[in-house]
């Protein structure tokens, strides 16, 4: 019964519909009585606020989580909120804290904390460290993240293996499994793109379009060279969240292929640089610009 209470909330979370997750948890607050269930709901509630960029709210509401009675998961959420609020400024201290927690054994049996730490490592592009944290994990969110990391480092074989493990834990038609398979199909390319696109479209029709689902559809459309369709999907995503870095990156890619005016493309590149300095697209642009400056200096 406990799992049923949070089922819709978690499903919205996996789909990237963070406000609906928050709304569902708030609506069912009187049913969330058990201590373990309250801890679970708080975890997803604060993850949503963090995803929305409401870092100060999380830090303010959890400020009493200190001392001998400190909840490790809440401490992890505080660390994530603090880190994301000022990544460059808080990077060193965050990584030191994580190292200490790992050394103290705090992380080993706390799968929520494992995901939080892996998220920070992923953001810092420390993929080996993230994989070590999630090594041998057998929980849904951890496996979903493992698949993301394996795809990021071009290990499609290991992503497929993690997906096979996931299918043993949850129904293949459950949202996390459908999302994971769709991304694996995207990386397989060619005919698999059609299957991935259908999956994203079906989820969007069933649960409503979210930036995550719209971006998934757009990536498929770009891969199939259906750039006008991709543009329409990405503009819809921007209307829902103008600060979604993946939407901006995919729109840049789409507009380059559509040969849109340079000033339009550059405007989105500048926006992405400001919002997400560590995004793969930002890093690639910065590297290209640096190489251009080096080449230019040789002729001065």
UniProtKB/Swiss-Prot annotation:
It is a peripheral membrane protein. It comes from the Eukaryota. Disulfide bonds: none annotated. Pfam families: Coatomer_E. One of its GO terms (molecular function) is structural molecule activity. Coiled coil: none annotated. It is found in: Cytoplasm; Golgi apparatus membrane; Cytoplasmic vesicle, COPI-coated vesicle membrane. GO terms for cellular component: COPI vesicle coat; Golgi membrane. Keywords: Cytoplasm, Cytoplasmic vesicle, ER-Golgi transport, Golgi apparatus, Membrane, Protein transport, Transport. GO terms for biological process: endoplasmic reticulum to Golgi vesicle-mediated transport; intra-Golgi vesicle-mediated transport; protein transport; retrograde vesicle-mediated transport, Golgi to endoplasmic reticulum. Oligomeric complex that consists of at least the alpha, beta, beta', gamma, delta, epsilon and zeta subunits. The coatomer is a cytosolic protein complex that binds to dilysine motifs and reversibly associates with Golgi non-clathrin-coated vesicles, which further mediate biosynthetic protein transport from the ER, via the Golgi up to the trans Golgi network. The coatomer complex is required for budding from Golgi membranes, and is essential for the retrograde Golgi-to-ER transport of dilysine-tagged proteins. Belongs to the COPE family. This is Coatomer subunit epsilon.
């Amino acid at each position: 019964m406990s799992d049923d209470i949070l089922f819709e909330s978690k499903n919205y979370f996996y789909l990237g519909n963070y406000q609906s997750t928050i709304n569902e948890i708030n609506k069912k607050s009187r049913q969330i009585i058990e201590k373990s269930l309250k801890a679970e709901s708080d975890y997803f509630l604060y993850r949503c606020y963090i995803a929305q960029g409401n870092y100060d709210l999380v830090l303010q509401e959890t400020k009493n989580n200190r001392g001998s009675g400190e909840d490790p998961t809440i401490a992890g959420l505080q660390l994530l909120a603090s880190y994301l609020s000022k990544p460059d400024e808080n990077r060193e201290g965050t990584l030191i804290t994580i190292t200490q927690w790992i050394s103290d054994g705090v992380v080993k049996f706390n799968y929520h904390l494992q995901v939080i730490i892996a998220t920070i490592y992923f953001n810092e592009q420390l993929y080996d460290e993230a994989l070590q944290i999630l090594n041998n994990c057998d929980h849904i969110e951890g496996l979903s993240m493992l698949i993301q990391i394996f795809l990021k480092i071009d290990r499609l074989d290991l992503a497929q293996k993690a997906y096979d493990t996931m299918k043993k834990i949850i129904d293949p038609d459950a949202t996390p499994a459908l999302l994971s398979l769709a991304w694996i199909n995207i990386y397989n390319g060619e005919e698999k793109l059609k299957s991935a696109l259908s999956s994203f479209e079906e989820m969007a029709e069933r649960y409503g379009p979210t930036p995550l689902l719209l971006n998934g559809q757009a990536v498929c459309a770009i891969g199939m060279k259906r750039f006008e369709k991709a543009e329409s999907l990405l503009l819809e995503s921007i209307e829902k969240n103008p600060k979604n870095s993946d939407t901006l990156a995919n729109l840049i890619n789409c507009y380059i292929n559509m040969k849109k005016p340079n000033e339009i493309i550059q405007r989105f590149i500048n926006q992405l640089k400001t919002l997400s300095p560590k995004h793969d697209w930002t890093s690639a642009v910065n590297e290209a610009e640096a190489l251009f400056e080096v080449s230019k200096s040789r002729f001065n």
